[in-house]
């Protein structure tokens, strides 16, 4: 409702338990804004030094959103963009995720990540405590935009990634296996470079 009457250049959404990292956030962020559609800063979990959704190591992609999200508590969005793509109020948990999918992935809006701490996240909210409902909403949203076969591919890639992340540390404990993995990796890179 507030979006309709917002008149500033950028806006940010926070839940009732979230708050700005410190009193200098807006001043610090204003130095980083150079006409980006979306600017994302760091968000810390309340009572810890843990960052939620750290910036991707490469350009943000569909797979990044499929596997996680962007923390809306640390995201400054151009007001005109938010008015063009209002949050879907029929969704209880994932309306921000749908917004990011629509704007960044399908409308190719520009996004910038910054190391500036923006917010402290209260992880006692509905999205933190109801992962199955969030998964259900995300799958519903994906089915609106993508064919089932594409969704199945993303699920398969996610399973492979989880398996790799689980097995690799275990396999690397043995020097022989670690050396073998290195040789195989080097060979695969050589084959790939020839193609």
Task: Describe the predicted segments one by one.
Residues 1-6:
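Glycine-rich, basic loop-to-helix element that forms the pyrophosphate-binding segment
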Residues 7, 22-28, 95, 99, ...:
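Acidic donor-diphosphate engagement hotspot in glycosyltransferases and nucleotidyltransferases
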Residues 8, 34-38, 108-109:
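Short, high-confidence coil segments that cap the C-terminus of an alpha-helix
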Residues 11:
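Short aromatic/hydrophobic "clamp" motif used to bind/position activated sugar donors
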Residues 14-16, 94:
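Active-site acidic Asp-centered loop
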Residues 19, 23-53:
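Conserved donor NDP-sugar-binding/catalytic core segment of glycosyltransferases
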Residues 52-141:
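Conserved nucleotide-sugar donor-binding catalytic segment
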Residues 147-148, 153-195:
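Membrane-proximal basic amphipathic "stem/tether" segments
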């Amino acid at each position: 409702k507030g979006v309709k009457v917002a008149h500033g250049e950028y806006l940010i959404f926070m839940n009732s338990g979230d708050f700005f990292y410190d009193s200098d956030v807006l001043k610090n962020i204003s130095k980083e804004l150079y006409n980006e559609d979306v600017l994302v800063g760091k968000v810390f979990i309340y009572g810890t030094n843990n960052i939620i959704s750290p910036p991707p190591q490469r350009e943000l992609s569909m797979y990044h959103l499929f596997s996680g999200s962007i923390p809306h508590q640390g995201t400054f969005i151009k007001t005109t963009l938010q008015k063009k793509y209002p949050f879907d109020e029929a969704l209880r948990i994932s309306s921000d995720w749908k917004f990011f999918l629509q704007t960044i992935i399908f409308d190719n809006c520009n996004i910038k990540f910054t190391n500036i701490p923006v917010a402290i996240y209260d992880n006692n909210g509905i999205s933190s405590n109801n992962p199955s409902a969030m998964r259900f909403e995300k799958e519903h949203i994906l089915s609106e935009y993508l064919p089932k076969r594409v969704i199945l591919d993303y699920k398969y890639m996610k399973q492979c990634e989880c398996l790799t992340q689980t097995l690799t540390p275990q396999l690397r404990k043995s020097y022989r296996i670690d050396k073998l993995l290195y040789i195989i990796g080097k060979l695969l890179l050589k084959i790939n470079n020839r193609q």
